[in-house]
């Protein structure tokens, strides 16, 4: 053993660690490595220290401050990353480690970063704006489904549509919903549905899956095809917790394919309830309409009665009777006052001690009586004359007298008497009052 030891090279710990480091750096050099970050720390120096691991192993890593400043994201535990590193050994402790030169997101982390970048770009262009959203048809007669023909999502949609609204026409646009061909096929089917115009609304979606599985619904081409679709589109991708770019661009986002089917279909009982409700509203509207027309007819009849010539004549007759009554009352009052004055004078004469004065006053009284009788006769005669003249004038002005001589009174629809042809237009209704009856006619021509 001592002989063997004399022939072997004996290393110190430092020499061994140095040799191992040189061997690692010389033989492996720079490597590319993917893994999940764990045990991440960042001391005040700014360097990053962490481990990269997979299901079976892990390795210590260091990324110095000047290098990690170039990384476009903040490293965190759980991130999947792709690193370029040098394999080395930390001699003081003999720890095998990687010195990281560059770092990029990998797997879902990279996809999530691309997702956020595209989301910001499309939002800045206004593709998510609410005023671009189209309303879903209130009663869809046909619905198009863009999805995998063999997927469970299609069966869920068809089952709900059949249960809720069997009369709804369904058109299936088969496409891949995962893989390299999915993006182009989805865009093609959206454009085909818009070209055919055989459906009222489109459902675009699939069942649940990983972010990578759902990635075709995060592609920019699919987002722009949804935005430019003239048919309203419901996105129904994955489960309620899955969010895709298609959800933001679509007119309506359904949390699941089943929920999308319920959005485009109306339950039969709901349709019957809606029909009954509208029937009630129609009946109420018709009742209000007829009541309004009846009230209008009653108002027109009342106005016609008020403007009838016989009504006007009755009013004039009442006014004449009132005037005659006032005249007779005035004359009676005048006579009573004169008689009272004469009685007073007679009493004064009877009480006078002077016969001559009595005789003289008697003569005056006789004269006054004669004058009074003469004046009263003139007054009554003049009053009778004036009364006869007024009655004759009133009778001559009576519309019925004019109508009795073969004349007529023509009025417009507002009840105004027509004096010339400029007060009416061709096509309007007019009413003609005769001595007996009214004729309603329509103006066909006018002459000056």
UniProtKB/Swiss-Prot annotation:
GO terms for molecular function: exodeoxyribonuclease VII activity; nucleic acid binding. Belongs to the XseA family. Pfam families: Exonuc_VII_L (PF02601), tRNA_anti_2 (PF13742). Signal peptide: none annotated. It catalyses: Exonucleolytic cleavage in either 5'- to 3'- or 3'- to 5'-direction to yield nucleoside 5'-phosphates. The keyword Cytoplasm applies. It comes from Histophilus somni (strain 129Pt). This is Exodeoxyribonuclease 7 large subunit. One of its GO terms (cellular component) is cytoplasm. Bidirectionally degrades single-stranded DNA into large acid-insoluble oligonucleotides, which are then degraded further into small acid-soluble oligonucleotides. Coiled coil: none annotated. PANTHER family: EXODEOXYRIBONUCLEASE 7 LARGE SUBUNIT. One of its GO terms (biological process) is DNA catabolic process. It is found in: Cytoplasm. Keywords: Cytoplasm, Exonuclease, Hydrolase, Nuclease. Its EC number is 3.1.11.6. NCBIfam families: xseA.
């Amino acid at each position: 053993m001592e002989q063997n030891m004399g022939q072997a090279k004996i290393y110190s710990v430092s020499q061994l660690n140095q040799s191992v480091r040189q061997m690692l750096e010389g033989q492996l050099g720079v490597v590319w490595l993917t893994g999940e970050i764990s045990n991440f720390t960042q001391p005040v120096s700014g360097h990053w220290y962490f481990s990269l691991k997979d299901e079976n192993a892990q390795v210590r890593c260091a990324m110095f401050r000047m290098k990690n400043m170039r990384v476009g994201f903040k490293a965190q535990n759980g991130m999947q990353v792709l690193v370029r590193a040098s394999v080395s050994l930390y001699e003081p402790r003999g720890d095998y480690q990687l010195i990281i030169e560059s770092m990029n997101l990998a797997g879902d982390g990279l996809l999530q970063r691309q997702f956020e970048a595209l989301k910001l770009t499309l939002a800045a262009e206004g593709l998510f704006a609410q005023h671009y959203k189209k309303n879903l048809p209130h009663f869809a007669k046909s619905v198009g489904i863009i999805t995998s023909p063999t997927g469970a999502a299609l069966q869920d949609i068809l089952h709900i549509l059949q249960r809720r609204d069997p009369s709804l026409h369904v058109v299936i646009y088969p496409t891949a919903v995962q893989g390299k061909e999915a993006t182009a096929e989805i865009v093609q089917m959206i454009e085909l549905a818009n070209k055919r115009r055989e459906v009222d609304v489109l459902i675009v979606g699939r069942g649940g899956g990983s972010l990578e599985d759902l990635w075709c619904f995060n592609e920019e081409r699919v987002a722009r095809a949804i935005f430019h679709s003239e048919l309203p589109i419901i996105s129904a991708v994955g489960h309620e917790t899955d969010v895709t770019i298609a959800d933001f661009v679509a007119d309506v986002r359904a949390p699941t394919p089943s929920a999308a089917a319920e959005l485009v279909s109306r339950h039969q009982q709901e349709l019957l309830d809606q029909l009954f409700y509208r029937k009630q509203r129609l009946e109420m509207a018709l009742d209000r309409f007829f009541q309004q027309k009846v009230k209008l007819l009653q108002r027109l009849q009342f106005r016609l009665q008020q403007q009838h010539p016989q009504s006007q004549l009755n009013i004039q007759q009442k006014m004449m009777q009132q005037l005659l009554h006032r005249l007779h009352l005035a004359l009676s009052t005048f006579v009573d006052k004169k008689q009272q004055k004469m009685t007073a004078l007679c009493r004064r004469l009877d009480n006078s001690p002077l016969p001559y004065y009595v005789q003289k006053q008697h003569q005056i009284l006789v004269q006054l009586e004669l004058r009074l009788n003469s004046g009263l006769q003139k007054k009554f005669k003049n009053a009778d004359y004036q009364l006869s003249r007024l009655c004759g004038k009133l009778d001559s002005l009576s519309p019925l007298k004019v109508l009795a001589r073969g004349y007529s009174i023509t009025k417009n629809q507002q009840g105004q008497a027509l004096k010339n042809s400029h007060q009416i237009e061709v096509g309007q209704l007019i009413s003609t009052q005769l001595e007996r009856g009214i004729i309603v006619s329509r103006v066909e021509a006018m002459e000056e």
